Amino acid sequence: MAFRMSRDHADFVAHGGTEWDDGAFVNVKKIKIFHDWAGITLVQFDYIDGTGAIVSGLDHGTEPFQFDREHGRVPVEGARAEFWLRDDEYITIVTAFGGYCVRKIEFITNKRTFDFGGFN
């Protein structure tokens, strides 16, 4: 997963990651985060387009998984978090913490703060 901060701050791109852009939309409606023991593995945004419809952005990263001897690659339970933004709410600040990978990501809106991960 990669994340690039605003132009007036230093760039932050996780090791091996690439910068991404979901395009132009009216507003962010929902943010979905997957994480595992190492940190944030996937970020996905739902947007409101110009007609008022909800559009799902691309998955940036991969869902966390573990290996099971009987079933192979299986999803990790409880490793997903998401939040919906209210109609009058918008993101003002995004902060990511990490080095080799994104360990924690924080979204601050005009009304609330959401933390994902747990490592500073």
Curated annotation (Swiss-Prot):
It comes from Arabidopsis thaliana. Residues 6-120 form the Jacalin-type lectin domain. Keywords: Lectin. PANTHER family: JACALIN-RELATED LECTIN 3, JACALIN-RELATED LECTIN 34-RELATED. The keyword Transport does not apply. PROSITE patterns: JACALIN_LECTIN (PS51752). The keyword Repeat does not apply. Belongs to the jacalin lectin family. GO terms for molecular function: carbohydrate binding. This is Jacalin-related lectin 39.
